[in-house]
Amino acid sequence: MMDRVDFELGEKKYVCISVRSTNHKPFDVTSAKYILRNGDQEEKAGTCEIKQKSDTETVLSALIQPMIKGATYTLEYTYEIPPEILKYEVRVYVS
């Protein structure tokens, strides 16, 4: 099941995901970006803030402001833990 966040129209706030090591070994997220989509239409894209909480956990934050009331967006994170490139999606609802 996809994570979900709710926005009121006009809100601008951070949406954060936590990336954790599955094998309890240290890792580094070397880059992270996001795309906010309404259907197939890209509304915003940018670079995530990367905050390492510990050797085995990093938080990725995207500051977004969805602009269409009643819309359902997809916020797609793409991040790199060399040699891997991973993706994660969050559903964004605007009321």
Q: Where in the sequence are the language-model features?
A:
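Contiguous segments within soluble domain cores/interaction surfaces
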Residues: 1-95
